[in-house]
């Protein structure tokens, strides 16, 4: 696998992730099960974004010093583009978590505990998926066309799909788990397992955790190929992806109270997926520069947010008129 990642870069990335996760877990342990406030969520979100940008700046500086700016500039731009794509697509993941927690009636104080383990599991699963995907692409380059067609299909499907939490209980995964696990009827505080009459029971909280992990794998199948459209360097794909999902938990609590205000966002994300899919399909005929890709993704998100703001304004105006 061709990569700009050196032992120093890999080691530096690992140290940053381990330190930040340790601090996060330590604070979680001291405070116990409680909901993250909007102020805390905003603070952690800003911290993760700032840390990601600082890492990219350090990454650029290291490459500029060791290999020159002709290498550093496009690689740092690839990281930024991959990070923006993953961060954008992660919002849809957050909305699915909202539906899961609502359907299973998980109180806010326990949602944070589930998401701690959910993000840790996502780090492991995505790392495996990224290295496996990179290896497959190096062996079978035609897979990029498969990924492109898949993203094109997914984008159209996302735009047309209707989100409905009422059908969660009928999902094959949920039905299978309920049929094969000895499970309590109600959530037992913050426990994933409890003992009753000498028998070990799973709790609905474990079911929610498994569904959170499962939903992340499903979204990773979309987002990881999307970053492969920008670069196939495993270091950039992994670091941009993980930095984006490390801030997912804070993003969840930041958006959980205002999710209904982002009704148009899924259409913007759908357009991004369609654009990336087309980019991958036409790569042999026309190579879209990374800077153009970054501009297009940023432009789509900006236009979507402007339209979303206008829609909310019109809706609020109608409500006030009633």
UniProtKB/Swiss-Prot annotation:
Family affiliation: Belongs to the TerC family.
Q: Which domain of life is it from?
A: Bacteria
Topology term for the membrane:
Multi-pass membrane protein
| Record protein name field | Putative membrane-bound redox modulator Alx
Looking at the UniProt record for this protein, which Gene Ontology cellular component terms does it annotate, in alphabetical order?
plasma membrane
Annotated coiled-coil positions are none
Q: Which organism is it from?
A: Salmonella typhi
Question: Which spans are transmembrane here?
Answer: 7-27, 44-64, 90-110, 114-134, 136-156, 199-219, 226-246, 262-282, 287-307
- What InterPro entries does the database record attribute to this sequence? Integral_membrane_TerC, Integral_membrane_TerC_rswitch
Q: Where is the signal peptide?
A: none
Q: Keyword Signal, does the record have it?
A: no
Any idea where this protein resides?
Cell inner membrane
- Primary residence: membrane
User: Which keywords appear in this protein's UniProt record, sorted alphabetically?
Assistant: Cell inner membrane, Cell membrane, Membrane, Transmembrane, Transmembrane helix
Q: What does this protein do?
A: Has been proposed to be a redox modulator.
Side Periplasmic, residues: 1-6, 65-89, 135, 220-225, 283-286
Residue ranges, Cytoplasmic side: 28-43, 111-113, 157-198, 247-261, 308-321
């Amino acid at each position: 696998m061709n990569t700009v990642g050196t032992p120093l870069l890999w080691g530096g990335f690992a140290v940053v992730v381990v330190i930040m996760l340790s601090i996060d877990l330590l604070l979680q342990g001291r405070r116990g099960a409680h909901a993250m406030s909007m102020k805390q969520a905003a603070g952690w979100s800003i911290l993760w974004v700032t840390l990601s940008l600082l890492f990219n700046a350090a990454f650029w500086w290291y490459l500029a010093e060791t290999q020159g700016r002709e290498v550093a500039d496009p690689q740092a731009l690839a990281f930024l583009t991959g990070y923006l794509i993953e961060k954008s697509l992660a919002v849809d993941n957050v909305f699915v978590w909202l539906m899961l927690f609502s359907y299973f009636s998980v109180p806010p104080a326990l949602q944070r505990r589930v998401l701690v383990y959910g993000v840790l599991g996502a780090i492991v699963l995505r790392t495996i998926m990224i290295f496996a995907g990179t290896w497959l692409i190096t062996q079978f380059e035609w897979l990029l066309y498969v990924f492109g067609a898949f993203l094109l299909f997914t984008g159209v499907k996302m735009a047309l799909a209707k989100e409905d939490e009422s059908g969660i209980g009928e999902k094959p995964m949920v039905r299978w788990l309920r049929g094969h696990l000895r499970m309590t009827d109600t959530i037992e505080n913050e426990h994933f397992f409890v003992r009753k009459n000498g028998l070990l029971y799973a709790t609905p909280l474990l079911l929610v955790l498994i569904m959170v992990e499962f939903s992340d794998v499903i979204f990773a199948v979309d987002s990881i190929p999307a970053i492969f459209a920008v670069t196939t360097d495993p270091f950039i794909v992994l670091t941009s992806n993980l930095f984006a999902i490390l801030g997912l938990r804070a993003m969840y609590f930041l958006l959980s109270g205002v999710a209904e205000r982002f009704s148009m966002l899924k259409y913007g994300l759908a357009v991004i997926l369609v654009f990336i899919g087309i980019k991958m399909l036409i790569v042999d005929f026309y190579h879209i520069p990374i800077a153009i890709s970054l501009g297009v993704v940023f432009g789509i998100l900006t236009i979507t947010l402007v339209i979303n703001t206008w829609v909310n304004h019109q809706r609020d105006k109608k409500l006030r008129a009633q």
